[in-house]
Amino acid sequence: MPDAMSAGAILRALLPEMLLSGGAMLLLLASVWTPQGNQPGAAEGAERTSVLARFGVILCLVVGLAVVIAWGDGAAGTPDGRVAGDGFRWAVDLVILLGTALALMLLEAEHQRSAAFGPEVPSLMLLASTGMMVLAGARDLMFVFLGVELMSLAVYVLAGVNRRSARSAEAAVKYFLLGAISSGFLLYGMALLFGATGSTRLQDITEWAAAQATLSPLFMSGVALLLVGLAFKVAAAPFHLWTPDVYDGAPLPVTAFMSATVKTAAFAVFARIMIEGLAVAAPRWHMGLWWLAAVTMVVGNVFALSQRNLVRMLAYSSIAHAGYLLVSIIVGDAAGTSALIFYVVSYTLATMGAFGVLITINGGRDRAPTLDDIAGLWLVRPWLAIAMTVFLLAFMGMPVLGGMGFFAKWYILQAALQAPAPQTILAVVLVIASAVSAAYYLAVVSAMFMRPRPEGQPVPSTTPLNQSLIATAAVALLVFGLYPTPIMELARRATTTTSPTSNPAAPRGEVRLQTASVPR
């Protein structure tokens, strides 16, 4: 009976991941199934991709409902504590599913223009999302590695999924080679931590570190290598060099998926490992992470200034946003992690909306859109120019017109300044970096509204699906920018501990992520 009870608890804890992976496998089977073994024609294959993308969106909604029910019912993690059942996991899962659903909608919109994607692509996105959800709940380094590899292997393929494009193939090779190196750092760091502590569970690692008078060089070497591997996954400088080339070469829907959803999952596991698992070692890793955040904010924004290629500009912008999110991890308390959740919601909406506009103006061409392509957009598609302005101002953090983007940065600044150990200098760097970002974001706005439309430039045409995605993302950013309380309240509930500190070994100011009860 105890074994049956344990099996039931494990099934309940992993039900969302099982639903998503099972649905992904069914869609994969549907992508290759043909009646009586007949090979589908090109038109049938193209239509099948669109249909499977729609089923993928429905699957994300179903799994999202399962996550909401699990959160509301107080579903716990696995009995051995290797998978969390806390609000942080469920909140991040919902953001991941939101990003995946929007990316699938972008995929269909792009596919209707270029017919560049095979019917297996929606399944690959869903499998990658399964790995991301594993990362969101992982409390064991082996589960972390399992989630990273499941996510990464699918995304490597997605980057090169347009087999008619040499740029896409180049992006896939670069991402695979550099991703394999980063996974080596990650795995070697985990091995050293296991060698030092005798366990891969975050709770055991924390308890071991708390019992030591001094932390061994073996342990700290493992922490350093783990930090390098995670920094690559979130595209933090100087481990960001792959980002512009891969984003530029990958298909636009895949780039949006990588920029928003992959980053959300990577930061979720980054936060859980550093705040929950390695909090005792914070005095040793804090300064390294501090410099990583500062350099990332500066490098991302400075290199974005000279870009005319809009995808490369957004790639460097995403590097800068990684720096902002690192500040929330450095803060290391409930305010910081709740600000992180709010930020990734805002960033996901703005990124998906912005790439929806880029897909529209690019018209299915095998190249990244430039400033010339978006010039004079106000003259031919005013609503697209207005929506793109909302997304860019959200990235910048402009009050009111930037919607949620302003409060996303405000909450991180507030957490940094009100932390037990205030991060005043980092807050100043964040403000200055955001001011620098205004130059390249407003350059795009200026091109849309102030420059004439180049002769011979086609008028962008949109599909109803892409129109609805862009409009929904823009309206959501504006509405929750005027009334951010519901999202922020959910983020606070997701990251508030049930006691003043559920990790007695953590240093002052460190709050362990919620472990059992669900917010009421």
From Swiss-Prot:
Subunit structure as annotated in this protein's UniProt entry: NDH-1 is composed of 14 different subunits. Subunits NuoA, H, J, K, L, M, N constitute the membrane sector of the complex.
Compositional bias of kind Low complexity: 494-508
Family membership: Belongs to the complex I subunit 2 family.
Reaction equation(s) it catalyzes: a quinone + NADH + 5 H(+)(in) = a quinol + NAD(+) + 4 H(+)(out)
Record's subcellular location: Cell inner membrane
EC number: 7.1.1.-
This protein's UniProt keywords: Cell inner membrane, Cell membrane, Membrane, NAD, Quinone, Translocase, Transmembrane, Transmembrane helix, Transport, Ubiquinone
TM ranges: 13-33, 55-75, 87-107, 115-135, 141-161, 176-196, 219-239, 250-270, 285-305, 313-333, 339-359, 383-403, 425-445, 468-488
Protein name: NADH-quinone oxidoreductase subunit N
GO cellular component terms listed in the entry, alphabetical order: plasma membrane
Region (Disordered) residue spans: 494-520
Gene Ontology BP annotations: ATP synthesis coupled electron transport
GO molecular function: NADH dehydrogenase (ubiquinone) activity; NADH:ubiquinone reductase (non-electrogenic) activity; quinone binding
The species this protein was found in: Gemmatimonas aurantiaca (strain DSM 14586 / JCM 11422 / NBRC 100505 / T-27)
Function: NDH-1 shuttles electrons from NADH, via FMN and iron-sulfur (Fe-S) centers, to quinones in the respiratory chain. The immediate electron acceptor for the enzyme in this species is believed to be ubiquinone. Couples the redox reaction to proton translocation (for every two electrons transferred, four hydrogen ions are translocated across the cytoplasmic membrane), and thus conserves the redox energy in a proton gradient.
Any Pfam family hit: Proton_antipo_M
